[in-house]
């Protein structure tokens, strides 16, 4: 199970600022934090993802005015993974952003196993 709970050495404000920095680097837009949404995603009765998705408004982005972001631990505790997903249909909610991220991670794992 992936745990997408908030964490940062400097607390919640640093965590939000760190996500804003990643969003600016990846998407070239200033992001304003709007809210935190808890998400639990299950498959066949098992929880496969549980955490909090941060919702940001984007300014001057060519495709959307919203982005979802979170960080989760990896096999290497010193190297957490930051995920950002643009609010572009069919991604229209924090939950759908998590679902898209899970599908993408599954595809990447399959490709790595084949290659």
How would you describe each model-predicted region?
Residues 7, 78-115:
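Mixed-charge, Lys/Arg-enriched low-complexity segments
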Residues 19-26, 39, 67-70, 98, ...:
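Extended hydrophobic/Leu-rich segments
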Residues 7-49:
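Negatively charged, low-complexity tracts enriched in Asp/Glu with abundant Ser/Thr
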Residues 35-92:
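Acidic, low-complexity, intrinsically disordered interaction modules
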């Amino acid at each position: 199970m992936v745990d997408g709970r908030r964490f940062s050495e400097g607390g919640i404000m640093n965590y939000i600022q760190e996500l804003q920095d990643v969003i600016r680097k990846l998407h070239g837009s200033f992001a304003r934090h709007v809210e935190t949404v808890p998400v639990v995603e299950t498959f066949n009765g098992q929880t496969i993802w549980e955490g909090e998705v941060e919702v940001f408004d984007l300014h001057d982005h060519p495709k959307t005015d919203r982005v979802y972001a979170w960080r989760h631990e990896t096999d290497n505790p010193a190297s957490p993974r930051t995920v950002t997903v643009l609010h572009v249909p069919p991604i229209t909610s924090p939950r759908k952003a998590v679902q898209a991220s899970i599908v993408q991670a599954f595809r990447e794992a399959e490709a790595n196993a084949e290659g």
